[in-house]
Swiss-Prot record:
Organism of derivation: Sodalis glossinidius (strain morsitans)
GO BP, sorted A to Z: phenylalanyl-tRNA aminoacylation
Keywords: Aminoacyl-tRNA synthetase, ATP-binding, Cytoplasm, Ligase, Magnesium, Metal-binding, Nucleotide-binding, Protein biosynthesis
InterPro entries according to UniProt: aa-tRNA-synth_II (IPR006195), aa-tRNA-synth_II/BPL/LPL (IPR045864), Phe-tRNA-synth_IIc_asu (IPR004529), Phe-tRNA_ligase_II_N (IPR004188), Phe_tRNA_ligase_alpha1_bac (IPR022911), Phenylalanyl-tRNA_Synthase (IPR002319), tRNA-bd_arm (IPR010978)
Binding partners and assembly: Tetramer of two alpha and two beta subunits.
GO cellular component: cytoplasm
Lineage, opening ranks: Bacteria, Pseudomonadati, Pseudomonadota, Gammaproteobacteria, Enterobacterales
Annotated protein name in UniProt: Phenylalanine--tRNA ligase alpha subunit
């Protein structure tokens, strides 16, 4: 076994030769580990006379401390060098542009609603809203929809009980408005509506917008002109538009409106008609003095036609790859 002083010199030399933390750890184990040189020195104390052991043990401990201090200093030096090397490798190019925050965008259905609100706002229409949980009167009775009408059936309507339901149309907003203010009235009523249907072109919840004008001398000609202008503005082209006779309990006469698609086929876009005299009477408006027209359209359907979307359900799946197309 080498002399203790020589052992310290040898240990310090090995420590200085260590070029990284892993090599330094091997040196520590060689000298200070369970089977290391200094452990062997301590074990050899039992061969000394009892009165000589304390002094010899103190010398060995001092030598161990010298080696431990040398290890700590070398470790600090190696860690500092490693940090400097890492910092040098990670140097930032301050001339690079920063990461920009990605801007969000309006949902395509929200874009459609905003576009329609803007158009009718310029014509003097105001936006009216109402509750989504309705009662029989506002959703059916006041709109001249009889008790036997199919729309009241469970397979079409979400009922809470015998009198309360999720509204199937925003027409209830028109009833509330006509009862709350005298003519002239000019409103649009956007909002969520609910029907028990789900397929490629229907969802249980969708967005609808209805419009209403009540005033003196309102005719079907006014209705046609308003909707012609709206459709040409919305689709941004001079479309062919046709009005087909139809039936709605709350309007008379009633019509459905089609536009000519790019494939040469007629596409239904909305329903409309002159407000039925019974509806006016139900809200206390004299049909002998006042008349009006109403129209209703599905926001998802118009959005599909405007942007060429084939499946209505895509609007509600929150797929960012789909939604980012409408920024």
């Amino acid at each position: 076994m080498p002399h203790l002083a020589d052992l310290v010199v040898q240990a310090k030399a090995d420590i200085e030769r260590s070029q990284d933390i892993e090599a330094l750890e091997l040196v520590r184990v060689e000298y200070l580990g369970k089977k290391g040189h200094f452990t062997q020195q301590m074990t050899a104390l039992r061969d000394l006379a009892p009165d000589a052991r304390p002094a010899a043990g103190a010398v060995i401990n001092q030598a161990k401390q010298d080696v431990q201090q040398a290890l700590a200093e070398r470790k600090a030096t190696l860690e500092g060098a490693a940090l400097e090397a890492w910092l040098a490798a990670e140097t930032l190019d301050v001339s690079l542009p920063g990461r920009r925050m990605e801007n969000g965008g309006l949902h395509p259905v929200s874009r459609t609603i905003a576009r329609i609100e803007h158009f009718f706002g310029e014509l003097g229409f105001s936006v009216a809203t109402g509750p989504e949980i309705e009662d029989n009167y506002h959703n059916f009775d006041a709109l001249n929809i009889p008790a036997h009408h199919p729309a009241r059936a469970d397979h079409d309507t979400f009922w809470f009980d015998a009198t309360r339901l999720l509204r199937t149309q925003t027409s209830g907003v028109q009833i509330r408005t006509m009862k709350a203010q005298p003519p002239p009235i000019r409103i649009i009523a956007p909002g969520r509506v609910y029907r028990n249907d789900y397929d490629q072109t229907h969802t249980p919840m969708f967005h609808q917008m209805e419009g209403l004008i009540i005033d003196t001398d309102i005719s079907f000609t006014n209705l046609k002109g308003t909707l012609h202008d709206f459709l040409r503005n919305f689709f941004e082209e001079d479309l062919q538009v046709r009005f087909r006779p139809s039936y709605f309990p709350f309007t008379e006469p009633s019509a459905e409106v089609d536009v000519m698609g790019k494939n040469g086929r007629w596409l239904e876009v909305l329903g409309c008609g002159m407000v039925h005299p019974n509806v006016l009477r139900n809200v206390g408006i004299d049909p002998e003095i006042y008349s009006g027209f109403a129209f209703g359209m599905g926001m998802e359907r118009l959005t599909m036609l405007r942007y060429g979307v084939m499946d209505l359900r895509a609007f509600f799946e929150n797929d960012l790859r789909f939604l980012k197309q409408f920024k």
